Amino acid sequence: MIVGYRDFILHYSYKGFHLRACSSNYVWDIGVNEARCSTSPELARDHLASGSCTCGFYAFKGSAQLNKFAPIHGAVLMWGKVVEHEFGYRAEFAQVESLFLPEIAVCQKASHSVNLSDLHVLVDARPIDAFTACSACMEHLFQCAGSYEPWWESFTYDQVLSQLAQNYEVPLIKQIQIKAAYE
């Protein structure tokens, strides 16, 4: 098994908070995630085939390559058919191993840094299953929703991170501890 590092964004549904890939709509499962070929059904039997197939789970080789402004960082275990690239890996199977507190908290609405304790997450609390949460400071929080509606609900970032760590059954690691834990 290989350890890789990746960024996530927050996804909220009636099931609570989950991790979503930054570059696609894929919501990470709790436990093992298996790649499914989306470009060509005939390649589905041969994941990570050469050519145009790009299915699989991507991660960087080191935590230094993570986007410091992404809302969530994590380490993932990768196995099965694995392709190594210059900056990372693409694997047939992956599982979230741990989550990291971000070094810098960023208000997504105004793109300014804030203290992690001042960051809140706004979600649509109606029973829908396709909403990406917006994290922002209190000043800009309800701009995420356009206008305040009674079904919008706000959580502190600490509440969200704790729920994610509990959902995925993984530890929540401070950035300064990453090197000691994995590198």
Regions found by a protein language model. Give the residues of each.
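Glycine-rich loop/turn
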Residues: 7-58, 63-73
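Cysteine-rich micro-motifs
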Residues: 123-142
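Residue-level signal for mature regions of secreted extracellular proteins and peptides
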Residues: 15, 30, 46, 100-103, ...
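A structural signal for short, hydrophobic beta-strand segments that form beta-sheets
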Residues: 88-103, 116-118, 144-149, 159-160, ...
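Cys/His-coordinated zinc-binding microdomains
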Residues: 41, 108-111, 138-141
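Cys/His-enriched microdomains
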Residues: 35, 105, 132-135
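ADP-ribosyltransferase catalytic core
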Residues: 44-109
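Short recognition patches in nucleic-acid-associated and regulatory proteins
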Residues: 108-126
